[in-house]
Amino acid sequence: FISGVEIAATAFANIIEDKPVRPINTGVYVVFVLLWGTGLGIICRMVPVLVSASWVAGLSVLYFVSSVLQFKFLHLWYPIVIPLVLQAPLSFLGSTGIKYAWLFKEFLVKQRMEEDLTSGGDLQESMMPGECPVIEGYQIAAKSTQAREVGGDFYDFIEASEDKLGLVIGDVTGKSVSGALVMSASRSVFRMLSEGDLSVANIMIQANKRLKKDIRSGMFVALLFAMLDIKKKILTLCSAGQTQPIHYVAETGETLLVETEGDSFPLGILDDADDQDTNIQFKPGDKIIFYTDGIVEAMNAKEEMFGFERLMEIMEHAGEMDPESLLNEIVNSVNAFAGNVAQHDDLTIIVLGVST
């Protein structure tokens, strides 16, 4: 079937130039119309309304002019009006298709992130000690609460020898699978280095060198490592950017922030760290807490931080509580202070007490 316009055009061309007009292939034309409408829909979805309206108007004019020029110089004929009439519904379909394609892509990305977080959370949980070590003459309590599916905090107990116990508490910058892998690497490094005769400071120095090579740029570990001489009741510790421990001295009833020696930069930042040992001589009834910054930086609805002062006030009554009770008192106080406000950092604490 050939329309009257095409017949007239063909006859006119035959008479004037002896070059008949060629109708475009139906399949090609249908594909063109679909691509035309879909393309306009994509443009409408990707650019602002005023810009997309200008694009549609401009492309419509361009299409009309190109059709006339093709008819004149190439003798190629196809309906001009149909794409212009169908461009609105086809644009809507194209725009809707792009919208749902983006939504599906976002769904896949979110699903992958959730799977990564689940894997990271499982990995992190597997690294936490199942229970605190039982040592004659001492009491130990520990707890870690994640603010998200995958936290950045971790702690560990290392049986370096029959007479020595290592304690590690750290906070990794990345709270994802990569962060969990850094935790695993940190844990392995300290366990391995603790098997030798290195001092606490030298263990920290060697750990920093190894982690600096292994972890990617921009990630680091704020960590405190301590070694307890069980018989001598001496705790030797070294801090790399971790919060200051608090020591309750039973003999005087004082509560002291422990000042550590050295640079105290987190592991993975400096190539050569200048770490130094800090020694504490325990006496019966003494207690010391190690904790991450999620404790003191916990926020309430007024955007106030829990802070060191509140923590020190609790520690002033440490003599009245065993390590487990002291830990629960601190955690409950932080939770009561924060209320229903979602926290963005993990809460991790270790309490070490010397029996009377």
Predicted regions and their residues:
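Hydrophobic alpha-helix feature that most strongly marks membrane-spanning transmembrane helices
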Residues: 17-20, 36, 48, 66, ...
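Active-site His/Glu-centered metal-binding helix of metallohydrolases
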Residues: 12, 173, 295
